[in-house]
Amino acid sequence: MSIPLPSAMPLLPPIYLPGQEPLPAGTSDWERQEMQTALKYQRYMGMVMESCPLKVTIAGVGGLAIGGFFSLMSATFAYEDPLSRASNKLTTTRAQTMFVFKEMGRNMWSSGRGFAKVGMVYSGVECCIEGYRAKNDIYNGVSAGFLTGAILARNAGPTAMLGGGVAFAAFSGAIDWWLRSAPADEI
């Protein structure tokens, strides 16, 4: 079956199959081939950026970095001196410095792991829900927030799972609603 040419039906817009659109006059075969290659790589990059494993990895790395940064910032404002917790009294400045840096590193790793775990679970669940529903709306974030909150509170029992799910769903719904709202200059 062939598509009728626009000249046969002058009041209808031209309809072209994807990849068969006309190019400007004077376009060489080499330029057409380069354009098709660029479009192919653009589609590949779009597929990679929409893949669940990449989203989960980005959330994990970002969570690790943010958690470590928050821990580093809280260490600078700590009320308790880490040297007072030392089991043996450190005499040299070098030993004291090494102890403080090791303590900060341990805290940064612990906090970063927690943030990474939350980010990876939420991102993975939300990506699976989005793939199942084939939609990108606020309900994906709310339902993913509920499931993530329940998963993270699973060791504390069913009541804590329900409470964690509701709290995480409300938080993620509020953030998603704020991110999807129109910017101030468009109102």
UniProtKB/Swiss-Prot annotation:
Name by which UniProt lists this protein: Mitochondrial import inner membrane translocase subunit TIM22
Q: Where in the cell is it found?
A: Mitochondrion inner membrane
Species annotation: Cryptococcus neoformans var. neoformans serotype D (strain JEC21 / ATCC MYA-565)
Task: Give this protein's Gene Ontology molecular function annotations.
Answer: mitochondrion targeting sequence binding; protein transmembrane transporter activity; structural molecule activity
- Mode of membrane association: Multi-pass membrane protein
Q: Which UniProt keywords apply?
A: Disulfide bond, Membrane, Mitochondrion, Mitochondrion inner membrane, Protein transport, Translocation, Transmembrane, Transmembrane helix, Transport
GO biological process terms, semicolon-separated: protein insertion into mitochondrial inner membrane
Q: Describe the family membership recorded for this protein in Swiss-Prot or TrEMBL.
A: Belongs to the Tim17/Tim22/Tim23 family.
